[in-house]
Curated annotation (Swiss-Prot):
Subunit structure: Part of the 30S ribosomal subunit. Contacts proteins S4 and S8.
InterPro entries linked to this entry: Ribosomal_Su5_D2-typ_SF (IPR020568), Ribosomal_uS5 (IPR000851), Ribosomal_uS5_bac-type (IPR005712), Ribosomal_uS5_C (IPR005324), Ribosomal_uS5_N (IPR013810), Ribosomal_uS5_N_CS (IPR018192), Ribsml_uS5_D2-typ_fold_subgr (IPR014721)
Positions of the S5 DRBM domain: 12-75
Gene Ontology molecular function terms on file: rRNA binding; structural constituent of ribosome
Membership in a protein family: Belongs to the universal ribosomal protein uS5 family.
A GO CC term assigned to this protein in UniProt: small ribosomal subunit
Any Pfam family hit: Ribosomal_S5
Source organism (scientific name): Listeria innocua serovar 6a (strain ATCC BAA-680 / CLIP 11262)
This protein's name: Small ribosomal subunit protein uS5
NCBIfam families: rpsE_bact
Described function: With S4 and S12 plays an important role in translational accuracy.
Highest taxon of source: Bacteria
Domain description: The N-terminal domain interacts with the head of the 30S subunit; the C-terminal domain interacts with the body and contacts protein S4. The interaction surface between S4 and S5 is involved in control of translational fidelity.
Lineage: Bacteria, Bacillati, Bacillota, Bacilli, Bacillales
GO biological processes: translation
Length: 167
């Protein structure tokens, strides 16, 4: 189990992915609230996402940022890209993440781009398979990131050195 990352100790940048107005129907009519989906990252291998709900948009965003700081994950990278191809799943959302050559940039749509850019991955290609709901795409991307392993981790799991592994 990886250690918990303290988001309060990092210099984080935040990006609002989506804001949604939701309604609760009561006897006197509708009561509106706002939900916010926010991604935070230090562009140096740490990224997290959070959701918040409140009567006003700024409060929802503040709550989402606090939640995101509690849900940080580490992103292993090789130079400016990810170590290997991976598919992340969540609900109906599925995201294919592939390493890309240097200078390619982040080839990804909306929510996935926000997660990858704030994670500090400069070159990656992605494809959304299935649901394109922002929350499902963000969660599927985070799931894919959690599956990533660098050469040192794989060598340790197999009981070999990195040189033996890479040939």
């Amino acid at each position: 189990m990886p250690e918990q990352i303290d988001g309060n100790k990092l210099d984080l940048e935040e990006r609002v992915v989506t804001i949604n107005r939701v309604a609760k129907v009561v006897k006197g009519g509708r009561r509106f609230r706002f939900t916010a989906l926010v991604v935070v990252g230090d562009k140096n291998g740490h990224v997290g996402f959070g959701t918040g709900k409140a009567q006003e948009v700024p409060d929802a965003i503040r709550k989402a940022v606090e939640d995101a700081k509690k849900n940080m994950v580490f992103v292993p990278t090789v130079d400016t890209t990810i170590p290997h191809t991976v598919v992340g799943h969540f609900g109906g959302g599925e995201i294919l993440l592939k390493p890309a050559s240097a200078g390619s940039g982040v080839t990804a749509g909306g929510p996935v781009r926000a997660v990858l850019e704030l994670a500090g991955v400069a070159d990656v290609s992605s494809k959304s398979l299935g649901s394109n709901t922002p929350i499902n795409m963000v969660r599927a991307t985070i799931d894919g990131i959690k599956q990533l392993k660098n050469a040192e981790d794989v060598a340790k799991l197999r009981g070999k050195t990195v040189e033996e592994l890479l040939g």
